[in-house]
């Protein structure tokens, strides 16, 4: 694929120690059961959805703007349209403990445009971030190891993470896509229209919450286009 030929952009020390501490402190407050998911049978890879209710952007706006900036720059550098919609699909906090990793060398972040990974802790062993380069798994541990380091890459570039052998590997993962900013408690698969999960949760919560959740889950751009079409038809 085209993405496989693109380089990973490494940003050593993109975030300061204070910014990393802000992210970790914020992540520690995000404890609602619906926004936490184990991605392994033995709980060695736990993901918390920090974008739930759009909290990451609202609570950490300056950090969000910095990370979106490097993501958009990568998008444009690889031929993307700067005027294209480029919104946060998901913000995830990953904690991987010994035995865990992301082992599929063919893994991609399907449906997204650009992914940003930020290292939040250096107190672990193993867990090297790798990408496939001409069929070989290349480690980026030399540039993506210290807290505040970031790697930015096209989401369809194949990547994986070696097994963690000691400590806890803590990483912030942001994915940007050509869709609306999502606030649902998962990695949304719908770039258009209302999120099925958000609407389903609203139904379970009760009719009083349904309307607000439904309209919050809608794609604002599609709503604007529909309203404009109605006005033209009048």
What kind of feature is each model-predicted range?
Residues 2, 6-9, 26, 54, ...:
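Residue-level detector of intrinsically disordered, flexible termini
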Residues 72-197:
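Catalytic core of non-heme Fe(II) oxygenases with the double-stranded beta-helix
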Residues 230-234:
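Long, low-complexity, Ser/Pro/Thr- and acidic-rich intrinsically disordered regulatory regions
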Residues 1-85, 193, 199:
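Non-heme Fe(II)/2-oxoglutarate
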Residues 52-63, 99-108, 202-206:
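Short, charged low-complexity intrinsically disordered segments located at boundaries
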Residues 4-6, 31, 132-134, 174-227:
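Double-stranded beta-helix
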Residues 38, 102-104, 228:
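A subset of signal/propeptide-processing and intrinsically disordered low-complexity segments
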């Amino acid at each position: 694929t085209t993405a496989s030929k693109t380089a990973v952009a490494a940003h050593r020390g993109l975030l300061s120690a204070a910014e990393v501490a802000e992210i970790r402190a914020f992540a520690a407050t995000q404890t609602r059961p619906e926004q936490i998911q184990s991605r392994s049978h033995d709980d060695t890879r736990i993901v918390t959805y920090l974008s739930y209710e759009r909290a990451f952007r609202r609570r950490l706006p300056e950090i969000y703007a910095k990370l979106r900036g490097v993501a958009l720059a990568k998008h444009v550098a690889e031929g993307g349209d700067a005027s294209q919609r480029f919104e946060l699909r998901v913000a995830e906090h990953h904690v991987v403990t010994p035995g865990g990793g992301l082992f599929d060398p063919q893994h991609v972040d399907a449906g997204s445009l650009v992914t940003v990974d930020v290292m939040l802790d250096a107190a672990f062993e193993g867990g090297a971030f790798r990408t496939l380069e001409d069929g070989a798994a290349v480690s980026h541990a030399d540039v993506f190891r210290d807290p505040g380091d970031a790697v930015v890459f096209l989401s369809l570039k194949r990547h994986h993470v070696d097994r963690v052998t000691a400590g806890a590997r803590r990483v912030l993962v942001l994915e940007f896509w050509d869709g609306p900013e999502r606030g649902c408690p998962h990695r949304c698969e719908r770039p258009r229209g209302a999120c099925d999960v958000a609407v389903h949760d609203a139904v379970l919560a009760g009719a009083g919450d349904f309307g607000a959740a439904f309209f919050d889950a809608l794609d604002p751009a599609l709503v604007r286009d529909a309203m404009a079409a109605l006005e033209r038809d009048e």
